[in-house]
Structures are given as structure tokens and as C-alpha cells.
Amino acid sequence: MPRSLKKGPFIDLHLLKKVEKAVESGDKKPVKTWSRRSMIIPQMIGLTIAVHNGRQHVPVFVSEEMIGHKLGEFAPTRTYRGHAADKKAKKR
């Protein structure tokens, strides 16, 4: 169920401060964050945000289409290596 419109988007305060600081200084370095639950807001457009996936920080370049989505959607946490191959088929 989506978040109520009257509540507005959720964004961690520490991330919001980092974003505002990066925007006013014009800094191009990635903003490092562990907050996967924060929503992408219009102020973040053009910034690169390094989102933690449990192992490393994945760089995410924010574009207009991403507004309203959460940061965690763009940093996958699981690596899919495929299903186990059939051993009988390999021997042939």
C-alpha cells in the first residue's frame, strides 16, 4: 500500500542535509548513504547518490523518471547467478 499523500514523501534528515549541501556547492562527488528507504525528490536530479546494498555503495545517477521511487529500488541486494545446471546434460 502506498504512502498517504497528506503525509508527503519520506526522506532521512541526514540525507536531505547532504543533498542540499551538494546542490549549493555544486559538488560532483557521490553522496554516500545507507538510507535505502528515502524517496527521491526533485532536488536530487543530476546528483550521483551512492546507495548501500549491504556489501558496497552502488552509484545511482538520479534522473527525472526516478522521482517518487525509493533509493533502494536502484541498488539490488541479491546477486542472481542462475539455477544449478543439470549434471546429466553436461556429460553428453
Curated annotation (Swiss-Prot):
Disulfide bonds: none annotated. GO terms for molecular function: rRNA binding; structural constituent of ribosome. GO terms for cellular component: cytoplasm; small ribosomal subunit. Signal peptide: none annotated. GO terms for biological process: ribosomal small subunit assembly; translation. The keyword RNA-binding applies. Keywords: Ribonucleoprotein, Ribosomal protein, RNA-binding, rRNA-binding. It comes from the Bacteria. Belongs to the universal ribosomal protein uS19 family. Protein S19 forms a complex with S13 that binds strongly to the 16S ribosomal RNA. This is Small ribosomal subunit protein uS19. It comes from Photobacterium profundum (strain SS9).
